[in-house]
Amino acid sequence: MTLLAAHAVVTVLALASVAWATNSSQGAKRWAHELVVLDDVDSFLGAASSLAYRAQLELGAPLRLSVGPQEPDPHADWWWRERVAGRFDRAPTSDELSSWYVSPPLRSAGGFEQLLLSWNIDCPPESGACFELRVRESDEHDWTPWLYVGDWGSAVPAATAVEPEDGSHLVTSDGPKLVAVDGARVDIDFFTSERTWSAAQFRVRATASGDQLNRSVIVRRVALCFSRRTDEPAPSFVPPAEAIRRLDVPFRSQKTERSGIAGRICSPTSVAMALGYRGLEVDTLAAAERIFDSAHDIYGNWTRAIQGAYSFGAPGYLARFSDWNEVARHIAEGTPLVISIAAKEGELDGAPYAKTAGHLLVLCGFDEKGDVRVNDPAASTPQAGQLVYRRDQLERVWMARGGTSYVILAPRKH
Protein backbone atom coordinates (compact mmCIF):
# COMPACT_ATOMS: atom_id res chain seq x y z
CA MET A 1 0.00 0.00 0.00
CA THR A 2 1.42 3.35 -1.00
CA LEU A 3 0.90 6.15 1.48
CA LEU A 4 0.27 9.56 -0.01
CA ALA A 5 0.59 12.52 2.32
CA ALA A 6 -1.92 15.30 1.69
CA HIS A 7 0.16 18.48 1.88
CA ALA A 8 -0.80 22.10 1.37
CA VAL A 9 -0.40 21.71 -2.40
CA VAL A 10 -2.73 18.80 -2.89
CA THR A 11 -2.62 18.79 -6.69
CA VAL A 12 0.78 17.07 -6.57
CA LEU A 13 0.76 14.54 -3.75
CA ALA A 14 4.12 13.36 -2.45
CA LEU A 15 4.88 9.65 -2.34
CA ALA A 16 5.83 8.54 1.16
CA SER A 17 6.87 5.09 -0.06
CA VAL A 18 8.55 4.04 -3.25
CA ALA A 19 6.23 1.73 -5.15
CA TRP A 20 2.74 0.47 -5.72
CA ALA A 21 1.83 -2.47 -3.54
CA THR A 22 0.47 -5.55 -5.26
CA ASN A 23 -0.84 -8.96 -4.36
CA SER A 24 -0.65 -12.23 -6.21
CA SER A 25 -3.75 -14.03 -7.42
CA GLN A 26 -3.01 -16.59 -10.09
CA GLY A 27 -4.63 -15.80 -13.43
CA ALA A 28 -6.06 -12.44 -12.36
CA LYS A 29 -4.93 -8.86 -12.21
CA ARG A 30 -3.67 -7.71 -8.85
CA TRP A 31 -4.81 -4.81 -6.73
CA ALA A 32 -2.73 -1.69 -6.14
CA HIS A 33 -3.63 0.85 -3.47
CA GLU A 34 -2.83 4.42 -2.44
CA LEU A 35 -3.73 5.97 0.90
CA VAL A 36 -4.36 9.68 1.48
CA VAL A 37 -4.87 10.88 5.06
CA LEU A 38 -5.95 14.40 5.99
CA ASP A 39 -5.35 15.05 9.67
CA ASP A 40 -3.76 18.49 9.96
CA VAL A 41 -4.54 22.08 9.05
CA ASP A 42 -2.39 22.14 5.91
CA SER A 43 -4.02 19.08 4.39
CA PHE A 44 -7.55 20.37 5.00
CA LEU A 45 -6.64 23.81 3.63
CA GLY A 46 -4.98 22.43 0.49
CA ALA A 47 -3.29 25.61 -0.77
CA ALA A 48 -6.55 27.53 -0.26
CA SER A 49 -8.30 25.32 -2.83
CA SER A 50 -10.81 23.98 -0.31
CA LEU A 51 -14.24 25.54 0.16
CA ALA A 52 -16.13 25.92 3.41
CA TYR A 53 -19.05 27.65 5.07
CA ARG A 54 -19.37 28.28 8.82
CA ALA A 55 -16.08 26.46 9.36
CA GLN A 56 -12.78 27.13 11.07
CA LEU A 57 -9.34 25.57 10.95
CA GLU A 58 -7.64 24.92 14.28
CA LEU A 59 -4.35 23.23 15.08
CA GLY A 60 -5.97 20.84 17.51
CA ALA A 61 -9.13 20.06 15.55
CA PRO A 62 -8.12 20.49 12.65
CA LEU A 63 -11.55 21.30 11.11
CA ARG A 64 -14.45 22.73 13.13
CA LEU A 65 -17.91 23.00 11.57
CA SER A 66 -20.37 25.26 13.38
CA VAL A 67 -23.81 23.71 13.85
CA GLY A 68 -26.95 25.19 15.32
CA PRO A 69 -27.27 28.78 16.52
CA GLN A 70 -23.97 30.58 17.17
CA GLU A 71 -22.98 33.72 18.96
CA PRO A 72 -21.48 36.11 16.38
CA ASP A 73 -17.80 35.51 15.58
CA PRO A 74 -17.20 37.72 12.56
CA HIS A 75 -13.43 37.26 12.52
CA ALA A 76 -13.59 33.47 12.15
CA ASP A 77 -16.33 33.64 9.55
CA TRP A 78 -14.44 36.33 7.62
CA TRP A 79 -11.27 34.21 7.51
CA TRP A 80 -13.04 31.33 5.82
CA ARG A 81 -15.28 33.47 3.65
CA GLU A 82 -12.49 35.62 2.21
CA ARG A 83 -9.26 33.63 2.38
CA VAL A 84 -10.46 30.10 1.67
CA ALA A 85 -13.66 30.36 -0.29
CA GLY A 86 -13.00 33.80 -1.69
CA ARG A 87 -16.45 34.16 -3.20
CA PHE A 88 -19.07 34.35 -0.46
CA ASP A 89 -20.95 37.62 -0.56
CA ARG A 90 -22.61 37.44 2.83
CA ALA A 91 -21.75 36.50 6.38
CA PRO A 92 -23.58 33.60 8.03
CA THR A 93 -26.52 34.51 10.21
CA SER A 94 -26.48 33.57 13.88
CA ASP A 95 -29.50 31.26 13.63
CA GLU A 96 -28.35 29.05 10.75
CA LEU A 97 -28.14 25.34 11.58
CA SER A 98 -25.81 23.84 8.98
CA SER A 99 -22.24 24.14 7.71
CA TRP A 100 -20.09 22.39 5.14
CA TYR A 101 -16.60 21.80 3.83
CA VAL A 102 -15.33 20.65 0.42
CA SER A 103 -11.84 19.19 0.18
CA PRO A 104 -9.25 20.15 -2.40
CA PRO A 105 -9.02 17.77 -5.38
CA LEU A 106 -7.18 14.64 -4.25
CA ARG A 107 -5.37 12.95 -7.11
CA SER A 108 -4.47 9.30 -7.54
CA ALA A 109 -1.03 8.71 -9.04
CA GLY A 110 -2.17 5.72 -11.08
CA GLY A 111 -5.91 6.24 -11.36
CA PHE A 112 -8.52 4.30 -9.42
CA GLU A 113 -11.57 2.10 -9.89
CA GLN A 114 -12.54 1.84 -6.23
CA LEU A 115 -12.28 4.20 -3.28
CA LEU A 116 -12.76 3.84 0.47
CA LEU A 117 -13.62 6.91 2.53
CA SER A 118 -13.44 6.92 6.34
CA TRP A 119 -13.53 9.56 9.03
CA ASN A 120 -13.11 10.38 12.71
CA ILE A 121 -15.49 13.11 13.90
CA ASP A 122 -16.76 14.43 17.23
CA CYS A 123 -20.49 15.22 17.30
CA PRO A 124 -22.11 17.02 20.25
CA PRO A 125 -25.65 16.05 21.27
CA GLU A 126 -28.40 16.72 18.72
CA SER A 127 -25.93 17.12 15.86
CA GLY A 128 -24.57 15.05 13.01
CA ALA A 129 -22.73 15.03 9.71
CA CYS A 130 -22.75 13.25 6.37
CA PHE A 131 -19.92 12.54 3.93
CA GLU A 132 -20.13 12.56 0.15
CA LEU A 133 -17.75 11.88 -2.75
CA ARG A 134 -17.43 13.04 -6.30
CA VAL A 135 -14.89 11.96 -8.92
CA ARG A 136 -13.62 12.94 -12.36
CA GLU A 137 -11.69 11.21 -15.12
CA SER A 138 -9.22 14.05 -15.81
CA ASP A 139 -8.78 17.79 -15.45
CA GLU A 140 -10.56 18.19 -18.79
CA HIS A 141 -13.67 16.39 -17.54
CA ASP A 142 -16.41 17.64 -15.23
CA TRP A 143 -16.93 16.31 -11.75
CA THR A 144 -19.72 13.81 -11.21
CA PRO A 145 -22.58 14.84 -8.92
CA TRP A 146 -22.01 14.24 -5.20
CA LEU A 147 -22.59 10.63 -4.11
CA TYR A 148 -23.76 9.93 -0.56
CA VAL A 149 -21.35 7.71 1.40
CA GLY A 150 -22.57 7.75 4.99
CA ASP A 151 -23.48 9.74 8.07
CA TRP A 152 -23.05 9.86 11.83
CA GLY A 153 -24.89 11.49 14.70
CA SER A 154 -28.44 12.08 15.85
CA ALA A 155 -29.23 14.97 13.49
CA VAL A 156 -28.61 13.89 9.91
CA PRO A 157 -28.25 16.54 7.17
CA ALA A 158 -30.60 16.59 4.19
CA ALA A 159 -30.16 13.76 1.69
CA THR A 160 -28.92 15.98 -1.14
CA ALA A 161 -27.42 19.45 -1.46
CA VAL A 162 -26.71 21.46 -4.60
CA GLU A 163 -24.40 24.47 -4.67
CA PRO A 164 -25.82 27.47 -6.54
CA GLU A 165 -23.65 29.63 -8.78
CA ASP A 166 -22.96 32.27 -6.13
CA GLY A 167 -21.67 29.57 -3.75
CA SER A 168 -23.11 31.31 -0.72
CA HIS A 169 -25.20 28.42 0.54
CA LEU A 170 -26.40 24.94 -0.39
CA VAL A 171 -29.90 24.19 -1.64
CA THR A 172 -30.90 21.02 0.18
CA SER A 173 -33.54 18.39 -0.43
CA ASP A 174 -34.86 15.43 1.55
CA GLY A 175 -35.37 13.34 -1.57
CA PRO A 176 -33.59 10.00 -2.14
CA LYS A 177 -29.85 9.90 -1.56
CA LEU A 178 -27.82 9.82 -4.77
CA VAL A 179 -25.54 6.75 -4.68
CA ALA A 180 -25.04 5.92 -8.39
CA VAL A 181 -24.15 7.95 -11.46
CA ASP A 182 -22.40 7.56 -14.81
CA GLY A 183 -21.34 3.94 -14.41
CA ALA A 184 -20.19 4.37 -10.81
CA ARG A 185 -21.86 3.79 -7.46
CA VAL A 186 -21.42 3.70 -3.71
CA ASP A 187 -21.96 0.07 -2.77
CA ILE A 188 -23.08 0.57 0.86
CA ASP A 189 -19.67 1.67 2.16
CA PHE A 190 -17.25 2.00 -0.77
CA PHE A 191 -17.12 3.60 -4.21
CA THR A 192 -16.75 1.25 -7.18
CA SER A 193 -16.73 1.63 -10.94
CA GLU A 194 -15.74 -0.21 -14.11
CA ARG A 195 -14.09 3.00 -15.31
CA THR A 196 -10.81 4.56 -14.21
CA TRP A 197 -10.87 7.95 -12.49
CA SER A 198 -8.02 10.33 -11.72
CA ALA A 199 -9.19 12.47 -8.80
CA ALA A 200 -11.76 12.68 -6.03
CA GLN A 201 -13.17 15.24 -3.63
CA PHE A 202 -15.09 14.68 -0.45
CA ARG A 203 -17.66 16.95 1.13
CA VAL A 204 -18.79 16.92 4.74
CA ARG A 205 -22.05 18.60 5.72
CA ALA A 206 -22.95 19.10 9.37
CA THR A 207 -26.15 20.19 11.08
CA ALA A 208 -27.91 20.29 14.44
CA SER A 209 -31.33 20.45 16.01
CA GLY A 210 -32.39 22.31 19.14
CA ASP A 211 -31.45 25.80 20.26
CA GLN A 212 -28.26 25.18 22.24
CA LEU A 213 -25.63 27.78 21.35
CA ASN A 214 -22.09 27.41 20.02
CA ARG A 215 -21.91 23.76 19.06
CA SER A 216 -19.41 22.37 16.56
CA VAL A 217 -18.82 19.10 14.75
CA ILE A 218 -15.06 18.53 14.83
CA VAL A 219 -13.42 16.61 11.99
CA ARG A 220 -10.22 15.00 13.28
CA ARG A 221 -9.27 12.80 10.34
CA VAL A 222 -10.48 11.84 6.87
CA ALA A 223 -8.83 9.04 4.90
CA LEU A 224 -9.23 8.00 1.28
CA CYS A 225 -7.85 4.73 -0.07
CA PHE A 226 -7.68 4.52 -3.88
CA SER A 227 -7.58 1.08 -5.56
CA ARG A 228 -6.94 -0.09 -9.11
CA ARG A 229 -6.10 -3.31 -10.93
CA THR A 230 -2.53 -3.77 -12.12
CA ASP A 231 -0.33 -6.26 -13.96
CA GLU A 232 2.71 -5.44 -11.83
CA PRO A 233 4.40 -8.39 -10.09
CA ALA A 234 3.92 -9.03 -6.40
CA PRO A 235 6.77 -8.17 -4.02
CA SER A 236 8.60 -11.07 -2.41
CA PHE A 237 8.02 -11.61 1.29
CA VAL A 238 9.94 -13.14 4.15
CA PRO A 239 8.52 -12.28 7.58
CA PRO A 240 10.95 -10.07 9.52
CA ALA A 241 11.85 -11.23 13.00
CA GLU A 242 9.92 -8.38 14.64
CA ALA A 243 6.68 -9.52 12.93
CA ILE A 244 7.01 -13.16 14.01
CA ARG A 245 4.76 -12.76 17.01
CA ARG A 246 1.15 -12.86 18.12
CA LEU A 247 -0.04 -9.49 19.32
CA ASP A 248 -1.89 -9.83 22.61
CA VAL A 249 -5.34 -9.15 21.20
CA PRO A 250 -7.95 -10.47 23.67
CA PHE A 251 -10.16 -13.06 21.97
CA ARG A 252 -13.92 -12.65 21.74
CA SER A 253 -16.52 -14.87 20.14
CA GLN A 254 -19.54 -13.57 18.29
CA LYS A 255 -21.20 -16.94 18.88
CA THR A 256 -21.64 -16.34 22.61
CA GLU A 257 -23.70 -13.18 22.10
CA ARG A 258 -27.47 -12.87 21.64
CA SER A 259 -28.62 -15.66 19.33
CA GLY A 260 -30.68 -13.42 17.08
CA ILE A 261 -27.64 -11.46 15.93
CA ALA A 262 -24.69 -13.72 16.79
CA GLY A 263 -24.19 -14.75 13.19
CA ARG A 264 -24.15 -11.14 11.98
CA ILE A 265 -21.75 -9.34 14.32
CA CYS A 266 -18.28 -10.41 13.21
CA SER A 267 -17.40 -6.76 12.52
CA PRO A 268 -18.33 -5.27 15.93
CA THR A 269 -16.85 -8.33 17.68
CA SER A 270 -13.56 -7.79 15.85
CA VAL A 271 -13.70 -4.06 16.60
CA ALA A 272 -14.26 -4.86 20.29
CA MET A 273 -11.18 -7.12 20.23
CA ALA A 274 -9.09 -4.35 18.68
CA LEU A 275 -10.41 -1.85 21.23
CA GLY A 276 -9.56 -4.25 24.04
CA TYR A 277 -6.02 -4.49 22.70
CA ARG A 278 -5.89 -0.68 22.86
CA GLY A 279 -6.95 -0.74 26.51
CA LEU A 280 -10.60 0.18 25.90
CA GLU A 281 -13.02 -2.37 27.32
CA VAL A 282 -16.21 -2.15 25.27
CA ASP A 283 -19.05 -4.63 25.49
CA THR A 284 -19.54 -6.45 22.18
CA LEU A 285 -23.25 -5.68 22.06
CA ALA A 286 -22.53 -2.02 22.81
CA ALA A 287 -20.14 -1.98 19.86
CA ALA A 288 -22.75 -3.68 17.70
CA GLU A 289 -25.41 -1.15 18.63
CA ARG A 290 -23.07 1.77 17.91
CA ILE A 291 -21.90 0.40 14.55
CA PHE A 292 -25.24 -0.91 13.26
CA ASP A 293 -26.26 0.48 9.86
CA SER A 294 -30.04 0.81 10.03
CA ALA A 295 -30.32 1.96 6.41
CA HIS A 296 -28.97 -1.38 5.17
CA ASP A 297 -29.78 -3.53 8.23
CA ILE A 298 -26.17 -4.68 8.65
CA TYR A 299 -23.52 -4.65 11.36
CA GLY A 300 -20.64 -4.81 8.87
CA ASN A 301 -20.60 -1.31 7.40
CA TRP A 302 -16.89 -0.48 7.14
CA THR A 303 -17.15 3.29 7.54
CA ARG A 304 -19.38 2.99 10.59
CA ALA A 305 -16.95 0.53 12.16
CA ILE A 306 -14.12 3.07 11.94
CA GLN A 307 -16.22 5.95 13.28
CA GLY A 308 -17.72 3.66 15.91
CA ALA A 309 -14.27 2.68 17.17
CA TYR A 310 -13.35 6.37 17.27
CA SER A 311 -16.48 7.18 19.28
CA PHE A 312 -15.24 4.71 21.91
CA GLY A 313 -11.85 6.42 22.04
CA ALA A 314 -9.64 4.81 19.38
CA PRO A 315 -8.91 6.74 16.17
CA GLY A 316 -8.37 4.90 12.92
CA TYR A 317 -9.07 4.63 9.23
CA LEU A 318 -9.94 2.23 6.43
CA ALA A 319 -7.04 0.96 4.35
CA ARG A 320 -6.39 -1.77 1.83
CA PHE A 321 -3.37 -4.03 1.74
CA SER A 322 -1.82 -5.93 -1.13
CA ASP A 323 1.75 -6.32 0.12
CA TRP A 324 2.61 -8.64 3.00
CA ASN A 325 5.60 -6.45 3.82
CA GLU A 326 3.21 -3.62 4.68
CA VAL A 327 1.15 -5.97 6.83
CA ALA A 328 4.30 -7.14 8.62
CA ARG A 329 5.31 -3.54 9.24
CA HIS A 330 2.03 -2.89 11.04
CA ILE A 331 2.44 -6.03 13.15
CA ALA A 332 6.03 -5.10 13.99
CA GLU A 333 4.78 -1.68 15.11
CA GLY A 334 2.16 -3.32 17.32
CA THR A 335 -0.91 -2.61 15.19
CA PRO A 336 -3.34 -5.49 14.57
CA LEU A 337 -5.60 -5.32 11.53
CA VAL A 338 -9.29 -6.14 11.33
CA ILE A 339 -9.58 -7.71 7.88
CA SER A 340 -12.54 -8.40 5.58
CA ILE A 341 -12.58 -11.74 3.77
CA ALA A 342 -14.84 -13.84 1.55
CA ALA A 343 -14.11 -17.55 1.09
CA LYS A 344 -15.54 -20.30 -1.06
CA GLU A 345 -15.70 -23.83 0.28
CA GLY A 346 -12.21 -25.27 0.67
CA GLU A 347 -10.40 -21.93 0.32
CA LEU A 348 -9.46 -21.47 3.99
CA ASP A 349 -8.23 -24.56 5.81
CA GLY A 350 -8.99 -24.77 9.52
CA ALA A 351 -11.59 -22.01 9.58
CA PRO A 352 -14.64 -22.48 11.86
CA TYR A 353 -16.89 -22.28 8.76
CA ALA A 354 -16.90 -24.03 5.40
CA LYS A 355 -17.43 -20.84 3.40
CA THR A 356 -18.42 -17.22 3.92
CA ALA A 357 -19.79 -14.52 1.64
CA GLY A 358 -18.32 -11.91 3.97
CA HIS A 359 -16.58 -12.08 7.34
CA LEU A 360 -14.24 -10.02 9.51
CA LEU A 361 -11.50 -11.21 11.84
CA VAL A 362 -8.37 -9.86 13.51
CA LEU A 363 -4.92 -10.38 12.00
CA CYS A 364 -2.53 -10.60 14.95
CA GLY A 365 0.86 -11.66 13.57
CA PHE A 366 2.96 -14.23 11.70
CA ASP A 367 4.59 -17.53 12.52
CA GLU A 368 8.10 -18.60 11.54
CA LYS A 369 6.90 -19.93 8.15
CA GLY A 370 5.19 -16.66 7.31
CA ASP A 371 1.70 -17.98 7.87
CA VAL A 372 -0.79 -15.70 9.57
CA ARG A 373 -1.94 -15.67 13.18
CA VAL A 374 -5.53 -14.54 13.65
CA ASN A 375 -8.37 -14.20 16.13
CA ASP A 376 -11.44 -15.48 14.30
CA PRO A 377 -14.66 -14.46 16.13
CA ALA A 378 -16.67 -17.19 14.37
CA ALA A 379 -15.19 -19.70 16.83
CA SER A 380 -16.76 -20.20 20.25
CA THR A 381 -13.60 -20.31 22.39
CA PRO A 382 -10.07 -18.89 22.32
CA GLN A 383 -8.70 -22.38 21.79
CA ALA A 384 -10.81 -22.76 18.65
CA GLY A 385 -10.47 -19.17 17.43
CA GLN A 386 -6.81 -18.25 17.92
CA LEU A 387 -5.70 -19.83 14.67
CA VAL A 388 -2.95 -19.84 12.07
CA TYR A 389 -4.12 -19.54 8.47
CA ARG A 390 -1.98 -20.34 5.46
CA ARG A 391 -0.71 -17.09 4.00
CA ASP A 392 -1.38 -18.10 0.39
CA GLN A 393 -4.97 -18.94 1.27
CA LEU A 394 -5.53 -15.76 3.25
CA GLU A 395 -4.07 -13.81 0.35
CA ARG A 396 -6.72 -15.33 -1.91
CA VAL A 397 -9.68 -14.69 0.38
CA TRP A 398 -8.53 -11.28 1.63
CA MET A 399 -6.03 -9.45 -0.60
CA ALA A 400 -7.35 -10.72 -3.92
CA ARG A 401 -10.81 -9.57 -2.84
CA GLY A 402 -9.65 -6.05 -2.09
CA GLY A 403 -7.57 -6.34 1.09
CA THR A 404 -9.90 -4.12 3.12
CA SER A 405 -8.81 -3.51 6.72
CA TYR A 406 -9.74 -1.49 9.76
CA VAL A 407 -6.61 0.17 11.14
CA ILE A 408 -7.49 1.00 14.75
CA LEU A 409 -4.88 3.08 16.52
CA ALA A 410 -3.99 3.84 20.12
CA PRO A 411 -6.30 6.29 21.95
CA ARG A 412 -5.56 9.92 21.23
CA LYS A 413 -3.71 11.77 23.99
CA HIS A 414 -5.47 14.92 25.12
Model-derived regions: residue spans:
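A short beta-strand element within beta-rich, extracytoplasmic domains
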Residues: 110-123
